[in-house]
C-alpha cells in the first residue's frame, strides 16, 4: 500500500506533507517552496499554470487567473457572500445550471471543485516527485465550519485530481494533532485552536488526553465563519487605496481589472510588511492613465491605519471564540494552550486580541502555514494502520434536521456531536390518506427551516392510505467520519425504504465528476506528451551543440566521407528542430541517426582525451628532469595524438 499524503487545500496557499516513520516531512514543490499559492491560470494555448507561475502572470491575465476559489466551493450563486465576491473579483463568477456558483475562464464555465482539483493535482505531483512512486490516496483538510455541501465538493475535487480521499478532516483538528504529538507535557490538556486563514475562520476547543498510552484528541466544540479571512483584510487595504487615489486624482480604479490585480498584490505585500514594521509605502507607477497622461500611485500606510481599517474584522473572530468556549462547557481559564494557525495570525493586532480574550500568550512553536498539512499526514498514517497510538474524535459543526409541519426545523443531530454518529426518529403524515412524504434535510441553528441551509430532499412513496398521524415513518441520519451525511426514510408498515447520500440540488452529479476526471486524465496525458516532446527537443538541441563543437575541434581528424555524413545529418536535425510541428518520433529518429554517424567523431575525441590525460601524468612525473634538460616546452609540444616522450634524468 502506498503512502497516504496529507493536503492542506487552502484559500490562499496549499501545502502537502507525508510521514516517514514517526517523522513528518513537509514537501517542497518544483519551485522549491513548502507552500504553493492556490492560484490557477488558464492560458491562451490551453496550458494550465498552478501556484507561483500562475501568480507571476496574474497582472497581465486577470480575467483567466483564478484565486480564492475555496470561498465558492459548495456554495449557491444566490448566497449573499457569493454576491459580495462578484463585485470584488477580477474574474467572472457565474450561475451554473443547477444554481451553484461557478467561475469562468476563456468563456468556459468551470466548477470550483474542478479548479481546486488543479491545485490538488500539483500537490499530488509534488509528493510523487519526492517519493518516486505514484500517490493515489490522501487526507484533505477543510475549515471546521464547512457545511455538508462544501465537504462533498472538496471530496469531489480530490476525485477529479485522481485521488481517493480517505478522510476529510477539520483544519483546527489537524493543527491540534500536529501540536499534540510533538509535545512532551504529560496529563490532559485543553487547547484552543484559533485558525484565521486566507478565506475562512475557525476556532475549536480540543481536549488532548493520554488514555492508556494512546493520545486521544477529542473536539469539544467548534465555531467559525467560512467567509472571513486574510482576503478580506487585503480588500480593506484595496478599498482604502482606491478611495485615496480617487480623492487625489479623481480616477476610480475599481472598474479597471488590470489595476485591481496590481492593487491586490500591493495590498498583500503591504499587509505582510506592516506585521514587522510601523509604516510601508505603496508605489505603483503607471497604474492608469487619462486624457492628461499616465497616473502614478504613491501612498504611505502606517500600522495604526491598517489596524483601524480591519478592527471590526479582528473583532468578528472573538464572538465565535466565546460561543465555542460556552458550547464546550469550559471556562476561558481552563484553556492550557492557544494555538494559532493561518498566515493572518501573524498580524500583531490579531495576536493582541487573542491574548486579550484567552488571557495568555499564544504558543509560538507551531508553524501556522504547515501545521494543518502535518496533522493531515498524521491522520493519513493512522488510517493506513501504521500508527496505533492516536484516536481522533471530531464533531459536526452545525445541527442537522428536517422540516416538519409549519416549516419548523426539527433537529435530529445537534451541533458539536462527536462523529461518526447515527440517529433515528419516527414521524408521521400530516394529512389523511397521504401516499407520499417529502423529506427536506437542513443544516443550521435557526428555529425555522427556511433560515437554514437546505442540503437536499427526497420522497418516500407508496405509503398505504391511512388517517393522518397513523403511518410510522422512521427517518435515520447517519454522519460518517468525513462529516458527510447519509439519510434514510422507511415506512415501518410496508418496509419500503429510500436512502440518499446528501448531494443537494446543487453539487456535481456523478456524470459530471466522471467527465471532469476524464478531462483531467486527457489533459494529464496531453501534458505528458508535450513534456516528452520538449525533452526530445532539448536532447536534439544539446546534441546539435555538442556535435558542432566537436566538429570544430576534431573534424580535421576525420575522413572526408565521415565528415560529410555528420554534417548532412546535423543539418537535417537542425532543420527538423526549427519545424514547430515536428513530432517526438521524427526528432528521436534524427537524434539516433546523428548519434550513429558521429560515432567515429566520438572515438577520436575519447582517444584524444585519453592521450591528454596520459600526457599530463607523464609530464607531471618528469617535470623536474624536463626543467634540467631545458626541454619542458618541447615535451609539451610533443604531447600530440596519443604519442609522448618520456624525458629521463641525466
Swiss-Prot record:
Molecular function terms, GO-annotated: ATP binding; ATP-dependent protein folding chaperone; unfolded protein binding
Coiled-coil regions, chain positions: none
Domain of life: Bacteria
Region (Disordered): 614-635
Phosphothreonine modified-residue sites: 200
InterPro entries linked to this entry: ATPase_NBD, Chaperone_DnaK, Heat_shock_70_CS, HSP70_C_sf, HSP70_peptide-bd_sf, Hsp_70_fam
Induction: By stress conditions e.g. heat shock.
Keyword Chaperone: yes
Entry annotated with the keyword Chaperone: yes
Keywords, comma-separated and alphabetical: ATP-binding, Chaperone, Nucleotide-binding, Phosphoprotein, Stress response
Record family assignment: Belongs to the heat shock protein 70 family.
Function of the protein: Acts as a chaperone.
Protein name as catalogued: Chaperone protein DnaK
Organism: Burkholderia lata (strain ATCC 17760 / DSM 23089 / LMG 22485 / NCIMB 9086 / R18194 / 383)
Amino acid at each position: 500500500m502506498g503512502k497516504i499524503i496529507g493536503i492542506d487545500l487552502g484559500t490562499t496557499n496549499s501545502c502537502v506533507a507525508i510521514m516517514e516513520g514517526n517523522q513528518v516531512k513537509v514537501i517542497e514543490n518544483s519551485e522549491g517552496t513548502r507552500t504553493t499559492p492556490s492560484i490557477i491560470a488558464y492560458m491562451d494555448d490551453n496550458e494550465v499554470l498552478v501556484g507561483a507561475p500562475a501568480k507571476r502572470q496574474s497582472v497581465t491575465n486577470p480575467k483567466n487567473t483564478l484565486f480564492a476559489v475555496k470561498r465558492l466551493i459548495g456554495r449557491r450563486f444566490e448566497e449573499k457572500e457569493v454576491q459580495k465576491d462578484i463585485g470584488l473579483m477580477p474574474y467572472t463568477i457565474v450561475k451554473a445550471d443547477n444554481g451553484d456558483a461557478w467561475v469562468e475562464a476563456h468563456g468556459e464555465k468551470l466548477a470550483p471543485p474542478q479548479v481546486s482539483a488543479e491545485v490538488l493535482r500539483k500537490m499530488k505531483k509534488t509528493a510523487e516527485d519526492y517519493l518516486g512512486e505514484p500517490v493515489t490516496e490522501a487526507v484533505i483538510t477543510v475549515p471546521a465550519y464547512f457545511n455538508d455541501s462544501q465537504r462533498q465538493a472538496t471530496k469531489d475535487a480530490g476525485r477529479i485530481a485522481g485521488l481517493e480521499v480517505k478522510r476529510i478532516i477539520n483544519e483546527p483538528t489537524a493543527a491540534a494533532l500536529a501540536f499534540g504529538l510533538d509535545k512532551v507535557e504529560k496529563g490532559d490538556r485543553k487547547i484552543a485552536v484559533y485558525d484565521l486563514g486566507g478565506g475562512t475562520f475557525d476556532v475549536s476547543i480540543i481536549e488532548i488526553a493520554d488514555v492508556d498510552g494512546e493520545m486521544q484528541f477529542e473536539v469539544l466544540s467548534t465555531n467559525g465563519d467560512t467567509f472571513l479571512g486574510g482576503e478580506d483584510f487585503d480588500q480593506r487595504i484595496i478599498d482604502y487605496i482606491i478611495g485615496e487615489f480617487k480623492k487625489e486624482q479623481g480616477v476610480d480604479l475599481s472598474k479597471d481589472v488590470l489595476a485591481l490585480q496590481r492593487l491586490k498584490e500591493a495590498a498583500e505585500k503591504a499587509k505582510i510588511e506592516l506585521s514587522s514594521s510601523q509604516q510601508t509605502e505603496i508605489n505603483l507607477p503607471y497604474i492608469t492613465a487619462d486624457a492628461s497622461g499616465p497616473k502614478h500611485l504613491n501612498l504611505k500606510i502606517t500600522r495604526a491605519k491598517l489596524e483601524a481599517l480591519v478592527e471590526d474584522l479582528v473583532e468578528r473572530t472573538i464572538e465565535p471564540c466565546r460561543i465555542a468556549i460556552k458550547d464546550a462547557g469550559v471556562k476561558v481559564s481552563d484553556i492550557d494552550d492557544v494555538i494559532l494557525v493561518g498566515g493572518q495570525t501573524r498580524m500583531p493586532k490579531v495576536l493582541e486580541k487573542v491574548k486579550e480574550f484567552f488571557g495568555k500568550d499564544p504558543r509560538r512553536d507551531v508553524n501556522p502555514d504547515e501545521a494543518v498539512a502535518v496533522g493531515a499526514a498524521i491522520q493519513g498514517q493512522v488510517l493506513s494502520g501504521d500508527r496505533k497510538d492516536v484516536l481522533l474524535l471530531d464533531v459536526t459543526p452545525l445541527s442537522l434536521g428536517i422540516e416538519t409541519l409549519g416549516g419548523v426545523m426539527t433537529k435530529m443531530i445537534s451541533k458539536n456531536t462527536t462523529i461518526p454518529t447515527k440517529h433515528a426518529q419516527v414521524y408521521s403524515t400530516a394529512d389523511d390518506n397521504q401516499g407520499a412524504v417529502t423529506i427536506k434535510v437542513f443544516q443550521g441553528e435557526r428555529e425555522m427551516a427556511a433560515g437554514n441551509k437546505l442540503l437536499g430532499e427526497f420522497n418516500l412513496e407508496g405509503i398505504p392510505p391511512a388517517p393522518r398521524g397513523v403511518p410510522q415513518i422512521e427517518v435515520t441520519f447517519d454522519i460518517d467520519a468525513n462529516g458527510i451525511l447519509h439519510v434514510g426514510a422507511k415506512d415501518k408498515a410496508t418496509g419500503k425504504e429510500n436512502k440518499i447520500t446528501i448531494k443537494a440540488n446543487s453539487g456535481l452529479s456523478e456524470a459530471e465528476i466522471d467527465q471532469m476526471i476524464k478531462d483531467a486524465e486527457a489533459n494529464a496525458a496531453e501534458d505528458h506528451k508535450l513534456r516528452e516532446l520538449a525533452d526530445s527537443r532539448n536532447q536534439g538541441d544539446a546534441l546539435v551543440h555538442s556535435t558542432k563543437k566537436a566538429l570544430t575541434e576534431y573534424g580535421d581528424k576525420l575522413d572526408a566521407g565521415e565528415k560529410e555524413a555528420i554534417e548532412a545529418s546535423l543539418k537535417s536535425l537542425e532543420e527538423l528542430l526549427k519545424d514547430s510541428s515536428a513530432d517526438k518520433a521524427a526528432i528521436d529518429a534524427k537524434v539516433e541517426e546523428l548519434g550513429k554517424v558521429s560515432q567515429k567523431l566520438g572515438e577520436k575525441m575519447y582517444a584524444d582525451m585519453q592521450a591528454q590525460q596520459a600526457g599530463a601524468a607523464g609530464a607531471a612525473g618528469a617535470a623536474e628532469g624536463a626543467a634540467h634538460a631545458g626541454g619542458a616546452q618541447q615535451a609539451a609540444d610533443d604531447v600530440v595524438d596519443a604519442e609522448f616522450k618520456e624525458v629521463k634524468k641525466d
